Amino acid sequence: MRRSGTALSFLWTERVREPVDSGVAPVSPLGGGVILRRFSGTLLLPPLSSRLGSSGEAESAAHVVFTIGTQGTQRNLGSAQSSFDLENGLPGGKGLLDAQSGPSLGRALQPPVHHVQRRESFLYRSDSDHEPSPKAVSRTSSAASDLHGEDMIVTPFAQVLASLRTVRNNVAALAHGPGSATRQVLLGTPPHSSQQAAPTEDSGLQLVQETLEELDWCLEQLETLQTRRSVGEMASNKFKRMLNRELSYLSETSRSGNQVSEYISQTFLDQQAEVELPQPPTEDDPWPMAQITELRRSSHTSLPTAAIPRFGVQTDQEEQLAKELEDTNKWGLDVFKVAELSGNRPLTAVIFSVFQERDLLKTFQIPADTLLAYLLTLEGHYHSDVAYHNSMHAADVVQSAHVLLGTPALEAVFTDLEVLAAIFACAIHDVDHPGVSNQFLINTNSELALMYNDSSVLENHHLAVGFKLLQGENCDIFRNLSTKQRLSLRRMVIDMVLATDMSKHMSLLADLKTMVETKKVTSLGVLLLDNYSDRIQVLQSLVHCADLSNPAKPLPLYRQWTERIMAEFFQQGDRERESGLDISPMCDKHTASMEKSQVGFIDYIAQPLWETWADLVHPDAQELLDTLEDNREWYQSRIPCSPPHTMGSDRFKFELTLEEAEEEEEEEDEGQCTALNRESSELPST
């Protein structure tokens, strides 16, 4: 029984983890293999509501409200006064939900209320051509008309948990049928006076059959689970397989569609192109480590604290800059205007403003002149001649992350040290970016590719430069941190910046979606974030969202960012053309479609990421999803007519892994068997 392509619909109804007479009726599969699941509670994020002065480690008062269903039943899950440790979590073996008395300060992530039907991403389609979901009635774009009003479970591990919960409910229902007293004794459950109506004999047989099918599917998933394969990787492989099929279809529609498909596949699916072995450096070439050690000295001079400008930059338009930076806490700050008013120092101005807004200078005892020295040095190592990956982009990512960290669902969740690490990671995440891709550096045998063994080349370089600059004169903004704090911050920053490698996108998305959906189907539905792995996963996703936030910004800003990224792509394409290299996808200025690239980018990358983030922080990101959809429609309406793509040798071919190829063969065999059975049934009998 193949159920890997099934999307599980998740109903938000009233159920608590109680004995088997909780009133949950068995749920039957609907047509198309979609199964309705019932939710056991609201997804919660316990806060860290009080802080220690300069330690950066919060005192956690985890007062959590547990909201059930629509009737508002609540559980106060107390206050556990303890500090969070990155290595060991909460001390004394306590959990964030240890029951104590105290007022409720927690924030519940409420189930989505679909006031307006919104287009869903391709993640909610079937991942099997032979097992279409109810919405996959045509091979049009998955974002064209996929609308649903229920919360869908699509990650394999969460589906397994949901199926097992259905099995439990079915067994409970059978136990309440004829002879239920005997069955209750066997199940170890005392009989209760108030029971649901007992199922009839026919419905009982149907329930048994459905239960066996659920168990068969769960066993199939668990039997194929590899010992070194994480549950997040299960979802990642599924999403990659689904995206490959979507892109294969898109590549057949037109020549520009083929380019968009190739770009998305090579950029976001962690697929390395075949390249020649790099040649060793010649005697005339500089030593590779010079890329790190020979950093440019800052031209600024140290200023006394009293003389430091309000926003860290010398400008004769300080009042206009102050008015613009009033939007620092709002989504959609005009970074281009900030750059204009700050003398092309947007990163310094934005970070200086954010640090003051969050009182980080006082919390971590950072001298203002030291912060200014580091920021000016850091911004000086961003290339102003690079169209997109410059200090304006870094400032935009910093400000976007600052807003996301302040969303009501997360504003009291992370410690000051974690917030500092996230902002610092955003600040350095593209420093010294040369304006070309990792693959370009690998293909051209660059020194950076040699230094970092072709693995996240630019991301490793950004980290090395960002931390190296701390060694400059009066630049160490972390000098007053304890050794433990400094090591913890460095670990977090490394993890966050490496996660900005776009080839890791699908794995990051799968891990986040698996985390969110798994917590939804567990009995409490509480996202504890009580260990480093879970906390850094959310922070990595937050930084990744900030890095891919352009499509969710107001259209005038989004259009400027789009023009800049395309200009940078075209500059790389020109360099590749001059060097006799194959031109990378979307880098050929003669054939690339800006409009189609943005629609494809939103459909297959931005929307799946942002709708998953919106699930985590619901309902705080709903306006961003609306903006994302509006921006998509704007670019969609401006796609020029493109000639159909001929099935020539230049068509991009999608490669399947061995596992995916085996699944394809199984599906083809099943299809052939079905066809043969159909033909044999149509033969006249003799």
Curated annotation (Swiss-Prot):
Documented EC number(s): 3.1.4.53
Predominant subcellular localization, coarse grouping: other
Catalytic residues identified in the record: 389
InterPro entries in the record: HD/PDEase_dom, PDE4_UCR, PDEase, PDEase_catalytic_dom, PDEase_catalytic_dom_sf, PDEase_CS
Compositional bias annotation for Basic and acidic residues: 124-133
Pathway assigned in UniProt: Purine metabolism; 3',5'-cyclic AMP degradation; AMP from 3',5'-cyclic AMP: step 1/1
Entry-linked Pfam families: PDE4_UCR, PDEase_I
Sequence positions that bind Zn(2+) 2: 430
Subcellular location(s) of the protein: Cell projection, Cilium
Chain sites annotated for binding 3',5'-cyclic AMP: 389, 598, 601
UniProt keywords, alphabetically: cAMP, Cell projection, Cilium, Hydrolase, Magnesium, Manganese, Metal-binding, Phosphoprotein, Zinc
Free-text cofactor note: Binds 2 divalent metal cations per subunit. Site 1 may preferentially bind zinc ions. Binds 2 divalent metal cations per subunit. Site 2 has a preference for magnesium and/or manganese ions.
Binding site for Mg(2+): 430
Cofactor: Zn(2+); Mg(2+); Mn(2+)
Name of this chain's protein: 3',5'-cyclic-AMP phosphodiesterase 4C
Source organism of the structure: Mus musculus
Lineage: Eukaryota, Metazoa, Chordata, Craniata, Vertebrata
Gene: Pde4c
